[in-house]
Amino acid sequence: EPLRFTQLARPLDFAAVTDHAELFGEVEICTNPDAPGFLSPECVLYRSFPEQSFLIFNLAAVGLPELPQFPVPEGVPVVSDLPVIGSDGRIPRLPYCGLNGERCLEAAKTPWRDTQRAAEAFYDRSDACRFTTFVGYEWTGAPLSNNLHRNVIFASEVVPEIPPAYQETPAPELLWDALDERCREADGCAWLSIPHTS
C-alpha cells in the first residue's frame, strides 16, 4: 500500500520513447538470423542467457576493461577480446560488429527507423493536436560506471540517419558536437539534450 498517491490534474499530451542507442545495432544483429554475426559467441550468449548478457553487453558498451572477470554460466563461450577504452578515448564495439563497428552501425538504422515510425504513428497531426510524440533516444554515458545519461529529443521528424552513441562520443561535449554536425537547423533538424539520473 503506497503512503501517498499523486496524479496530474490532466494527462500529459506528449511523449518520447528514448531507447539506449549504444546497443541498437548489436541487438539487431543478435536477433536477426540473416545478419552476419548472428552466430557469434556474443550473440549466442545474448540469446541463451539474457540476464547475464544484459550485464556483459552493457558493460561492453561503456568500455570497461577485463570484462571476462564477471561470472559466465558454464558452457557459454568466454569472450576474451571484449572492448576496452582505446587511447583515443573511444570505445570499440563488440567483435562481431566488424571493422570500426560498421556492421553494428549499419544494423542500428533498423531500430532507429522503427523508433521514428512509432513516433509518427502516434502523433496527432490533426488540428486538434491532442497528443505529440517526439523522436528521441538515450545516450548512455557511463564512464567507469558513473551515470551521465542524456535523453536526446528531436523537434521534428527530421533526425540524423544514426544517432550518436556513447561508443563514438564518450563525453557530453562530443555528443553535442556530433549532434550539431548531424542535425543541422538549416535542414529542419533541431535537438535538445536532457541529463537524467546524473
Describe the residue ranges of each PLM region.
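Extended, charged catalytic domains and RNA/DNA-binding interfaces, predominantly
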Residues: 1-198
